[in-house]
Amino acid sequence: MNIPLTPIRFLQYAEQQFPGKTAVVCKDLRFTYAQFAERACRLAGALRKSGVKPGERVAFLSMNCHRLLEAYYGVLEAGAVLLPLNIRLAPHELAYILNDAGAKVLFLEKQFLEMADSFRQTLSRVQIFILLDERPQTNWLLPQNYEELLAAAAPYRADIMSFDENSTAELFYTSGTSANPKGVMLTHRNIYLHGLNVCLALHLSGDTVELHTIPLFHANGWGIAQALTFMGGTHVMLQRFDPAEVFRLIEQERVRACSLVPTMATALVNCPERGKYDLSSLERITIGGAASSPTLVREVEGKLGCSCFSGYGLTETSPMLTLSRMKSGVHWEGEQRYAGQAMTGYAVGGVEIRVVDSNDKDVPHDGKTIGEIIARSDGVMEGYWQQPEATAQAMRGGWFHTGDMATISENGYVLIVDRAKDIIVSGGENISSLDLEKTLAAHPSVYEAAVIPVPDEKWGEVPKALVVLKPDAKATEGELLEFCRSRLAHYKCPRSVEFLPSLPKTGTGKILKKELRKKYWGGQETIRPEFATKK
């Protein structure tokens, strides 16, 4: 017997097995799994009642909240495709995505009304606007808000056997660093099998209480959420990242786990209010979205009292590909353990990873030779929305090409050296900006750092460090340069250091290196050297 694989089954199972268990905590609201499932099915019924047909796109412009989590199941139950939108995008970027995806419905929070009003006349396909919270005085035609919509609808429960598991379930748009963002099509099968892998890799259970610190419209936000529902764990929603609020929720809800980007983890370990809260329930912090460092792993484990390791993946891979937990047969001690747990990690179950040269031939498993990470798994996307050429380029040879440059060791551990576009090519030598950033992070005065290439007449480009110091800390350019030279080959070290009050970041806390580079390249990065073929 073949039952279609769809994440709808995750919530159905949790409702059957854990109906009275707390499923979602959002501000002062709490929902059991029976209530969670009822609301998701009412959303499905409301969408069908509104004329939404199978395969049509339903967009959500929302911060982390219980309603967005309900959409991950209710929209799919209706047979539609969920389109979560990044709230940090500019109005013209949101308009592009809504038009490119052909969204029929847009759910949005009141705080985004003014912004959406600036582009709604340019939307070619959106027919229905629904407010997620109470209705303000507005010139918009908003006959109902979300709660009124649910109250007026009968629950709809789909016939699972009628689903095509290879049909698109969710459409996520990439950041579009060099062109318009691309829509990543994830199928019901992708999401279901990825969820099972996450359950195993992160040892999730019904006792897991997960704090959703990362927005659910991001890859490293939604991946765990789907899996946690299947296990009957508890979702705790965080609207905006604030260290004190994170600590308060950990104490109040007895949170056991959360995922962070490195800048979030850095903010937590440096928060002066940390000691005011009981963090004894916290067992695991997974760092993803950007490279970690041994220093950060050490500080998280020492100051927050929990295990800390890295996860790696992309929107196109659902997302998880690797995890840096110590695997059977590998034994690390002391600093070696911190370094290992800061690595990109080894392939999780169901994932195949290779590191290849420019001809897609495997590089030696020596932990030194640099190549590109390619992967295949049940979680790899169906393709890019209406972009067959981009899909073919990314999926050539039956493997997804990540664009991330890495080494691979004898025991299968992958270490990302850099994004291909962030590799610094100086005098024909490849220099990893991540290596430099990890080295700078070990300096006691450095809060965070970004290393970028800047033009140089002799070498083509050279590394430049942009550094934010810890509060009340002091360091000079010469001191930091000498610190790097004492730990790295001189040709790899920054040629200069600039101190900044802060670094530009995305909504999830990733450092925007593209913005930092603009000052030096004037937006003309195409003149930068290509990634060197010499390894």
Residue positions per predicted region:
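Conserved pre-ATP/AMP-binding loop-to-beta segment of ANL
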Residues: 19, 131, 136, 151-173, ...
